[in-house]
Design a protein with these regions (language model features):
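Polar/charged low-complexity regulatory segments
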Residues: 1-131, 135-137, 148, 152-187
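Conserved hydrophobic residue
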Residues: 141-142
Length: 187
C-alpha cells in the first residue's frame, strides 16, 4: 500500500519502462554497469522523452544524434576487436570459446528508451569481449601481460564512452521559473 507522499511523487514523475535480463560474467563489466547504467538510463529518459513532452524537439534531436554517434562508434570498435580475437582463434585452428565466470551476475535491467536498450546490448558485447580476451590467455594465444594490457585498454575505452554518454544532457528549460536569470547572476 502506497502512502500519500509516494502517490504524489509517482504521479508527478511517471515513466514507462521495460525489463531486460542482462548477464555479465566479467567483474569490470559488472562494476561499470552498477556505477553508470541507472544514471545514464534516467538521463536518456529526461533528455529525450521529457524534452519532447516539453515541446523541445530540436534539443532532444541534438541529444539523440550525439548519443547515436557515440553508440555507433563503440559498437563498431567492439565488433572489430571481437572479430580480431575470433580470427586469432581461427588462425590457431581453435573455436572461439564461450567463457563463464564464478562471479557471473544476472540483472533485471530496466530501460525506458531505445538508447537504453542499445546500451544494455553494448554492455553485453563489452562483457563478451573481456571474456574473449581472458580466453586468449587461457589458451596460450596471448601472454598474461598482453591480455591484462588489453583488458585495461578496453576498460578505459568503455569507461570514457560511458562518461561521454553521461555528459550528453539537456540544459534546463529556459522557460521554467527555476532557470530564470536573477539580477545577481548578471553581475
Amino acid at each position: 500500500m502506497q502512502t500519500e507522499k509516494n502517490e504524489h511523487k509517482s504521479n508527478r514523475f511517471t515513466r514507462t519502462f521495460f525489463e531486460q535480463d542482462l548477464i555479465l560474467s566479467h567483474r569490470i563489466a559488472q562494476q561499470l554497469h552498477k556505477r553508470f547504467y541507472d544514471r545514464i538510463d534516467h538521463s536518456f529518459f529526461v533528455s529525450m522523452k521529457v524534452l519532447r513532452r516539453q515541446h523541445r524537439d530540436t534539443e532532444a534531436q541534438q541529444i539523440e544524434t550525439a548519443v547515436q554517434g557515440l553508440c555507433d562508434k563503440m559498437e563498431c570498435d567492439l565488433t572489430q576487436a571481437s572479430e580480431r580475437i575470433v580470427a586469432t582463434f581461427a588462425k590457431a585452428q581453435m573455436p572461439s570459446p564461450c567463457g563463464h565466470s564464478d562471479i557471473t551476475a544476472s540483472y533485471k535491467a530496466e530501460y525506458s528508451t531505445g538508447y537504453s536498450f542499445r546500451l544494455l546490448d553494448l554492455f553485453s558485447r563489452f562483457d563478451r569481449l573481456l571474456m574473449q580476451i581472458e580466453a586468449l590467455e587461457l589458451h596460450n594465444l596471448g601472454t598474461a601481460d598482453e591480455c591484462t594490457s588489453l583488458i585495461r585498454f578496453w576498460h578505459g575505452e568503455f569507461h570514457r564512452f560511458l562518461n561521454a554518454l553521461t555528459a550528453v544532457r539537456s540544459r534546463p528549460d529556459p522557460h521554467s521559473s527555476s532557470s530564470k536569470e536573477t539580477p545577481h547572476d548578471k553581475a
